[in-house]
């Protein structure tokens, strides 16, 4: 199977007061302030949950003077429409303005927005609850440096900070039909569930080491999705498929048994196709959308 990576770049325009959607400037304040104009895209795939921004999606933006926010931290910008190209506007009282003296500032951003962060810039992550997926799809944008009121356009590029699992379940068509698999649940064992991410300094999310848990993934029919934390090793992790139509029989697959699933790499998406028969489970995998996680695909058997 050839290595696959679906490279997409969906742009979302962030419109702040002082700029209209058609690109024509509205009147600026008389005190000489200039409003930030920002665009944002997401590397590889535009959204963790799917390929569109959804109405109500919000990002947080920080304007930095060195390491200080000068009161311009965690400003909220929200989109009112569901579209591949979303327009974002500042919430009331959230507009960021450049200094009137044309001094330079830096900018960072993150998604999804939260009103309150620990110490003002530390985003806490908890993946123990998987629904809705978009609420735990943490993304950060690298710092954009050296902007001022004479050059107010800031382009953010977001990257995924966690790991996506995308699982398709199907019957072998001989001993079982898809109808027999109705209600199948999927879980993954041996998971850390807590992490922190500094939205100002960026970099990787920091996993908080604690007691591991089994996470029940979000299911929709014969599809299952999960967002989990990065892991240097997948040793001890197993996917479990519990089928009510087979008297609750459970099938297990050792994630670490696949050559390219030895680790869960941040920003990677791992796709698994699970074929279930009365004799057992066959697993194949490939990668799409996010940065390649398990290459061109893998196979395995579950018992």
Swiss-Prot record:
It is found in: Fimbrium. InterPro entries: Mfa-like_1, Mfa-like_1_N. Gene3D superfamilies: 2.60.40.2630, Fimbrillin-like (2.60.40.2620). Keywords: Fimbrium, Signal. Residues 1-22 form the signal peptide. GO terms for cellular component: pilus. The keyword Protein biosynthesis does not apply. It comes from the Bacteria. Transmembrane segments: none annotated. May be part of the fimbrial tip. Putative component of the fimbrium tip. Fimbriae are filamentous appendages on the cell surface that mediate cell adhesion and biofilm formation. Belongs to the bacteroidetes fimbrillin superfamily. Mfa-like family. This is Putative fimbrium subunit Fim1C.
């Amino acid at each position: 199977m050839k290595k696959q990576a679906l490279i997409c770049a969906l742009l979302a325009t962030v419109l702040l007061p002082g700029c209209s959607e058609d690109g024509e400037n509205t009147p600026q304040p008389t005190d000489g302030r200039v409003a930030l104009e920002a665009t944002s895209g997401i590397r590889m795939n535009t959204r963790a949950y799917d390929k569109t921004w959804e109405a109500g999606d919000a990002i947080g933006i920080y304007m930095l003077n060195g390491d200080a926010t000068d009161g311009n931290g965690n400003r909220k910008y929200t989109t009112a429409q569901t579209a591949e190209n979303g327009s974002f506007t500042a919430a009331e009282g959230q507009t960021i303005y450049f200094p009137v003296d044309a001094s330079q500032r830096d900018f960072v951003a993150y998604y999804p927005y939260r009103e309150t962060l620990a110490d003002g810039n530390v985003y806490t992550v908890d993946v123990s609850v998987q629904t809705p997926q978009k609420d735990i799809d943490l993304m950060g944008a690298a710092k954009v440096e050296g902007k001022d009121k004479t050059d107010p356009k800031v382009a953010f590029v977001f990257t995924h900070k966690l790991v996506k699992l995308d699982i398709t379940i199907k019957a072998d068509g001989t001993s079982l039909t898809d109808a027999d698999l109705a209600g199948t649940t999927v879980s993954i064992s041996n998971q850390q569930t807590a992490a922190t991410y500094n939205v100002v300094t960026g970099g990787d999310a920091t996993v908080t080491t604690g007691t591991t848990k089994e996470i029940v993934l979000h299911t929709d029919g014969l599809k299952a999705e999960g967002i989990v934390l990065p892991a240097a090793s997948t040793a001890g992790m197993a996917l479990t498929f519990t089928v009510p139509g087979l008297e609750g029989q459970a099938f297990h697959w050792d994630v670490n048994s696949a050559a390219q699933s030895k680790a869960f790499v941040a920003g990677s998406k791992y796709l698994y196709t699970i074929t279930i028969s009365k004799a057992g489970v066959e697993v194949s995998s490939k990668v799409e959308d996010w940065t390649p996680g398990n290459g061109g695909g893998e196979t395995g058997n579950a018992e």
